[in-house]
Amino acid sequence: MGNHAMLLEKHTAVRKGRLHDGKVMVMRSNLRWCSDGLEFACWNGEVIRLAFIIDAFDREIIAWTAVANAGISGSDVRDMMLEAVEKRFHATRAPHAIEHLSDNGSAYTARDTRLFAQALNLTPCFTPVASPQSNGMSEAFVKTLKRDYIRISALPDAQTALRLIDGWIEDYNEIHPHSALKMASPRQFIRAKSI
């Protein structure tokens, strides 16, 4: 195909947004939010895809979205970003810049998503390609969700799974202990910090 000039030119545009420097932990809430996604299968073969935003300090899942038998779209990610800002600040724009760390998935790197993030005062930041450990906070949550919730739940179909996710996230935020939070749940930790 190359001999007949049938190949597309290489993409040469430089993507705005810096690569992640490898440091995930921060010293207070709302400095860095990490985002990632996962998928799991129901017993009937239907597939659920879930994306979430987690605070790198207090570990609370601030917002999430899930779909059945489809991919997470840029629109889903943008809605999730807005929901996170609204939940944390009761406004449509964060009062200060927040680093939004994600992988290089197309829903996150899309131009519309990056511009929308900037309008919310979120600074898009991307992990190096093929380096999931650079977003360890998100990867740890994925492992916890699969081990402590998905694996032990009856998931006959997508409709059942989608109904259960809200309860899993609520349990994780309110009850699930974290060693990094001195065995408190994310919300217990947040409440203790605000006293």
UniProtKB/Swiss-Prot annotation:
Source organism phylogeny: Bacteria, Pseudomonadati, Pseudomonadota, Alphaproteobacteria, Hyphomicrobiales
Integrase catalytic domain ranges (all copies): 25-194
UniProt-listed GO biological process terms: DNA integration
InterPro entries recorded: Integrase_cat-core, RNaseH-like_sf, RNaseH_sf, Transposase_IS3/IS150/IS904
Gene source species: Agrobacterium fabrum (strain C58 / ATCC 33970)
Protein name: Insertion element IS136 uncharacterized protein Atu4601
Gene3D superfamilies xref list: Ribonuclease H-like superfamily/Ribonuclease H
Keywords attached to this entry: Transposable element
PROSITE patterns: INTEGRASE (PS50994)
